Amino acid sequence: MLLFGRIAAAALAMLAISAHAQTSPPADVSQDTKWHNDQMLYLVKLQRGEGWSATPSGLRYRRVKGDGSGARPSPTDTVTIHYTGRFIDGGEFDSSVTRGEPATFPLPRLIKGWQEGVPLMGVGDTFEFAIPASIAYGMKGKGPIPGGATLLFTIELIAIPG
């Protein structure tokens, strides 16, 4: 009887370990189906959100400051901006605001979401963008950004340098 008890206990332990392994998300979140679904669901919810607009590529945007009357950059311009990048859970992955210094970038060297979104802004405007992976870092990701991530940015367009 003692042997049967040990076998039963071992079997239950194996069953518990097996069940845990099947329900825990993979260490690489970019391969987790639920995680991917959450990324897309976030964008769908924004379609119904107050003040949000969408482009055919899936970029979501809204103006949070300014009136759009400032000069607008072309997709080939260099821009000076303040920005904060976050994941949909609110975690910040990059910010010129945190560093205390605006950044200057040529738009053609940036992700497609910025190439498409920043030219919608006028100097002095602040926009919020929700950028699907397809026009951000794709399914491979880059640095701290996992593949498939929807990225959220708050961007203030400061200048379009000569």
Where are these regions (language model features)?
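Cross-family detector of peptidyl-prolyl cis-trans isomerase
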Residues: 2-8, 12-15, 19-162
